[in-house]
From Swiss-Prot:
Species: Mus musculus (Mouse)
Compositional bias annotation for Polar residues: 502-515
GO biological process: lysosome localization; positive regulation of cell population proliferation; positive regulation of gene expression; positive regulation of ruffle assembly; protein methylation
Region annotation (Disordered) ranges: 297-410, 432-515
Residue stretches of biased makeup (Gly residues): 382-394, 457-481
InterPro entries: FAM98 (IPR018797)
UniProt GO molecular function: protein methyltransferase activity
UniProt name for this protein: Protein FAM98A
């Protein structure tokens, strides 16, 4: 049923296309397609459709009709190449075994349908295409140029049997006769004197094409500017009523402006040496002769708008001017932190070490004074006797008490608690502690020590905010001051509220080594 419908459509289309072959008879088409490529009548119909297509389309492949079934394989190869060039969309005609594609009746009908549709489309495009402009006077472009030369030189029409050599010899002779009648420098010497070969002419043509493309862009830009400028004049209410008059005047002149130039290699051959003279159009002497009154009428005098670099004021600074940094109010060393601070080096067992930190009630901690018999400092005050929380004398030794928040702490939270010390049990004191990130150390002799000694050496270094310096490694032994060697004693180390606290217990008969 499907094949019958396809046959009917094919027969109607063949009649419309002007086919006059034998396959228009009843049953002839079905008999031909049933044999496929082995039928000479089928191959002749395909060859006729392809020949009509080649007239309208640029096809390289061609199909020849067969005279016998033995040529069917060659015919199918030709059809395969043609369909590949035409980008046939039917897979059954472009895939599979080439020698067996057109042996199927349905594929043969599909091939005829495809070729007929392509031919119909090509003819419709040809009819709807705009007709080519006929050249004035007839003939090719070269003929028109030669005809113009003959007319300009006043030559008669050459005979029909003249050769090209004779024709150009006649033109050369006529040119010499014409040049003899004018002054010697009337035409001038040519600008291009060197002979050129085919390779040179190709390069010259390429250069000319590149320059032509560049100037075409410039011409389009200028024409677009002109269109926009003229269009802007029509924006006013007064000009809107004159739109038709403006278009009637502007459009004829606008149509004469072509974006493509007409300069060719022929203009290079016709160029004379007078074109190589370079004239300065901006010099005063030239402008005196070339200036016209229209320039002043159009422009007139305009006010000076400035803009000269030497007259422009410098821009304001992007950043505000820097001011000298002002020092803050002087305060006592202490509080929290305080860096390294300073340290006093004393040569006696009185004050020594750092004055840094904060006392319980003051902003600084004066860790000094003489020991012996007066107890210790506790939260900024003196108390009689010693205690575990506040420190104090223990068997005659001075123990450290510290600040309540952030300094020496005798058993309360914050900073190194109770510092660390290692000194004479009964005659010297070495305290180490943290005060808000700074390290404090006080080394001194107590009463009962050797005062003839050198103070207690150096006080510990002011530490950086996490280390106790050399004087106290993490709250350990105190500084480089006087060290005490004990025999028969032991340390008890324990933590209280996040800090270190060292207490000496069980020191028996400590012996002091001094210089």
């Amino acid at each position: 049923m499907e094949c019958d419908l396809m046959e009917t459509d094919i027969l109607e289309s063949l009649e419309d296309l002007g086919y006059k072959g034998p396959l228009l008879d009843d049953g002839a088409l079905l008999q031909a397609v049933s044999a496929g490529a082995a039928s000479p009548e089928f191959t002749k119909l395909c060859a006729w459709l392809v020949s009509e297509l080649r007239v309208l389309c640029k096809l390289e492949e061609n199909v020849q009709a067969t005279n016998s079934p033995s040529e069917a394989e060659e015919f199918q190869l030709e059809v395969s190449g043609l369909l590949g060039e035409m980008n046939c969309p039917y897979p059954s005609l472009t895939s599979g075994d080439v020698t067996k594609r057109l042996l199927v009746e349905k594929n043969c009908l599909l091939l005829l349908t495809y070729l007929i549709s392509e031919l119909e489309a090509a003819r419709m495009l040809c009819v709807n295409a705009p007709p080519k402009k006929a050249q004035e006077g007839g003939g090719s472009e070269v003929f028109q140029e030669l005809k113009g030369i003959c007319i300009a030189l006043g030559m008669s029409k050459p005979p029909a049997n003249i050769t090209m050599f004779q024709f150009f010899s006649g033109i050369e002779k006529k040119l010499k006769e014409t040049l003899a009648k004018v002054p010697p420098n009337h035409v001038g010497k040519p600008l291009l004197k060197k002979p050129m070969g085919p390779a040179h002419w190709e390069k010259i043509e390429a250069i000319n094409q590149a320059i032509a493309n560049e100037y075409e862009v410039r011409r389009k830009l200028l024409i677009k500017r002109l269109d926009v400028t003229v269009q802007s004049f029509g924006w006013s209410d007064r000009a809107k009523s004159q739109t038709d008059k403006l278009a009637k005047v502007y459009q004829p002149k606008r149509s004469l402006l072509s974006p493509k130039g007409k300069v060719s290699v022929a203009h290079l051959l016709a160029a004379r040496q007078d074109l190589s003279k370079i004239l300065r159009t901006s010099s005063g002497s030239i402008r005196e002769k070339t200036a016209c009154a229209i320039n002043k009428v159009l422009m007139g005098r305009v006010p000076d708008r400035g803009g000269r670099p030497n007259e422009i004021e410098p821009p304001p600074p992007e950043m505000p001017p820097w001011q000298k940094r002002q020092d803050g109010p002087q305060q006592q060393a202490g509080g929290r932190g305080g860096g390294r601070g300073g340290y006093e080096h004393s040569s006696y067992g009185g004050r020594g070490g750092h004055e840094q930190g904060g006392r319980g009630g003051r902003g600084s901690y004066d860790h000094g004074g003489r020991g012996g018999g007066r107890g210790n400092k506790h939260q900024g005050g003196w108390t009689d006797g010693g205690s575990g929380s506040g420190g104090g004398y223990q068997d005659g030794a001075y123990r450290d008490s510290g600040f309540q928040p952030g300094g020496y702490h005798g058993g309360h939270s914050g900073g190194y608690q109770a510092g660390g010390y290692g000194g004479f049990q009964t005659s010297s004191y070495t305290g180490s502690g943290y005060q808000g990130g700074g390290y404090q150390q006080d080394n001194r002799y107590q009463d009962g020590g050797h005062h003839g000694e050198r103070g207690s050496g150096r006080g510990g270094r002011g530490g950086r905010g996490g280390r106790g310096g050399r004087g106290s490694q993490g709250g350990g032994w105190g500084g480089r001051g006087s060290q005490t060697y004990h025999q028969g004693g032991q340390f008890e180390q324990h933590f209280q509220h996040g800090g270190y606290q060292y207490s000496h217990s069980g020191f028996g008969q400590g012996r002091h080594y001094t210089s």
